[in-house]
């Protein structure tokens, strides 16, 4: 588990290079006992903290709301995918948290990123949400604005990268990896995107090297230049459903 001292060091090496700090790269951030402190450290260093959670622990996350992260994304689609408990209680806890956090100024995004997959419960989820945030809702390009600082967002299901699966057969590829995101694992490993939770595309270690040095490495530059040409040069990228969904980048 990442210590406070280690987190401070990583933040110091990200400061000035990134704007948003997402507690997001696999795992459940609400499991970390120092998360409220981490949020404060990020803000002290001029970073904008954003959380992504599966929502199962929101009933005991009051201290997180009090820490005032910029945004919290709740992946409601994880319930149907993992069959965790009763839907009504799950949505109830999520909505109570959303109403509390949003009233403090935090943006809350309720995510249903399961279109084309396990989405049979979406209608029931929407009805439960409506009991906490009554209509009318304001339509947006990616979903709805439900209330002040509360949004419902949809997206298509995609296959996560898997080094063991076959490569996708696609004529062109694209990804925002190293364009507007990178990832740092708990051991300091820098990866190009938030989907590489195993560190298969290790670009360097932030505990050992400066971020500028890591991003200027031959491997990092080859990945970036490859996607500029709409080509996935890394084997893991060629096995990722996100880069192959080219329509995603033509909205």
Where are these regions (language model features)?
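Flexible mid-to-C-terminal extensions adjoining Fe-S/redox cofactors in radical SAM and related proteins
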Residues: 190, 195-251
């Amino acid at each position: 588990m990442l210590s406070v001292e280690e987190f401070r060091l990583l933040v110091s090496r990200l400061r000035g290079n990134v704007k948003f700090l997402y507690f997001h790269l696999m795992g459940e951030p609400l499991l970390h006992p120092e998360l409220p402190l981490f949020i404060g450290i990020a803000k002290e260093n001029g970073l904008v903290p954003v959380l992504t959670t599966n929502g199962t622990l929101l009933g005991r996350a009051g201290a997180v709301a009090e820490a005032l992260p910029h945004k919290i994304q709740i992946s409601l689609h994880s319930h149907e995918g993992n069959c965790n408990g009763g839907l009504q209680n799950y949505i109830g806890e999520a909505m109570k948290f959303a109403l509390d956090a949003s009233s403090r100024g935090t943006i809350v995004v309720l995510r249903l990123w399961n279109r084309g997959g396990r989405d049979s419960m979406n209608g029931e989820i929407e009805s439960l949400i409506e009991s906490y945030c009554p209509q009318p809702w304001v339509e947006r390009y990616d979903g709805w604005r439900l209330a002040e600082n509360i949004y419902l967002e949809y997206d298509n299901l995609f296959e996560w990268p898997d080094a063991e699966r076959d490569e996708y057969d696609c004529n062109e590829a694209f990804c925002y990896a190293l364009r507007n995101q990178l990832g740092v694992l708990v051991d300091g490993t820098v990866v190009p995107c938030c989907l590489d939770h195993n560190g298969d595309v290790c670009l360097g270690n932030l505990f050992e090297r400066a971020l500028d040095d890591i991003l200027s490495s031959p491997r990092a530059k080859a990945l970036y230049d490859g996607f500029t040409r709409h080509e996935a040069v890394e084997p893991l990228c060629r096995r990722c459903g996100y880069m192959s969904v080219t329509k995603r980048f033509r909205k």
